[in-house]
Amino acid sequence: YTGMIISTRESKATREKVIRLGVSQISGASKTSVGGYGSPAPEEENSAQFDVSDNRTLDEVVCWLMELGFIPSFCTACYREGRTGDRFMALCKSGRIGDCCHPNALMTLKEYLEDYASEQARRTGSALIRRELGNIPNERIRHIATERLEKIATGQRDFRF
């Protein structure tokens, strides 16, 4: 019940190899310097903690993951719902974590597609979401997720299981 994280320090090729081994978190468009998400610092003031090898945009990483058959997820629901520690482990051990993770991944991807994505990402992601909805085994959860995805398309946000 552990996860592996791979950062943008690694090349695209390395990231593609290891993601198939079970990497559960992957960075995209990371900034490693102080204030890096604000205005870029002049080169002489560069305070980067490490060099980035994968310089693709977040949209490029999201498209790449979808093309590889993965569902990019921006989910923070467990943390926000207090499902940490023993509560989280109980869901994992019972096998019920998928009742949360799968629909939450689809909903957070939908929010990204609506708010930030390129047209290519929207097309690819919309098709992926349609396919993946059918893979939610619990009919009740699938129905609720479908309703929430429709609400996201109308501008509502922040749904979670």
PLM regions with names:
Residues Y1-M4, L68-F70:
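A structural motif corresponding to the C-terminal end of an alpha-helix
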Residues T2-I6, I26-G28:
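Hydrophobic faces of well-ordered beta-strands that scaffold small-molecule active sites
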Residues S7-S11, K31:
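Active-site beta-loop-alpha junctions enriched in small/polar residues
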Residues A13-T14, Q25:
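Charged, low-complexity C-terminal accessory regions
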Residues E16, L21, S30-F161:
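Radical SAM enzyme core and accessory elements
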